[in-house]
Amino acid sequence: MKFIDLTIPFGIATPPWPTYEPLQVKYMKRLAPNGANGQIVSHSNHVGTHLDGEIHFYTPGKDIASLDFDFLAGDAAIVDLSDCCGDFDIYTPDMIEERVEVHEGDILIIHTGYHHFGWDQPYGNEVRYMVMHPGPDARFAHWCEEKKIKWIGVDCGSADHPMNTKIRDWMPAQAADCDAYFQETYGKSLPEIFTKDMYQMMHLWMFPKGIIHAECVGGDIDLLVNRRVQVGCFPWRFVDGESSIARIVAMVDEYEYQELMARKADLPKTKFGDCYDPVHVERLGGRGRTY
């Protein structure tokens, strides 16, 4: 068995979810005079590729240490929505099932393509990555429950639509752009589409049902879109942890791994060595406006 990394690089420049504490690192020992290098780190749980746990939003829920490996790893569907969703768009269960076969009890990884705007990417645009990515409607949340999805992964800042979170209040210019886009595209205003009772539904509705999610997935995800594969998420064994930084990988056999690595060799790379498919970037209009 071989692993394909679906985790973004983690460093002091990795942006946390807005208003959360970023990674900070300092040396507390050096080879001279201490004979060893040692570091102290501090950060929130919501920076880099991470798994949101139930108690992040649901007080009686499980902590991260309570999640067993049968839950964290297993059969998965990875779907690419970059051909149908752009800035502020809404995705539905139909869009997913038109592109990949999803079984009951699956892990579901959603490739919006917005990982291409992450801090580690040549087309980095933090505002698009955190504030303008696509997100789901209420039908999607109900469908996940019906499908008994184990957990969801997204390649952007949140499993919720950004304008169905506090970002709507923090970024009024983008909220106004989204409202205008919704009225033009869907015939309804932002408050009409994401009503008060739907607020952060992928967190507030889903976590009490045990359906949690990983955010900021990335790495070599472009190699594995619109297909089924084994996926594992490996957070800390974090007692009382509301969420956790995690390593997420896909698992393939040796023969397929060689095929995937041959394809990776033909694709452009980020400065950290992850590949990216220019087709996805072109669909989304390149870097887009910088703020």
Please annotate each region the language model reported:
Residues 1-291:
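Active-/binding-site microenvironments in catalytic and ligand-binding cores
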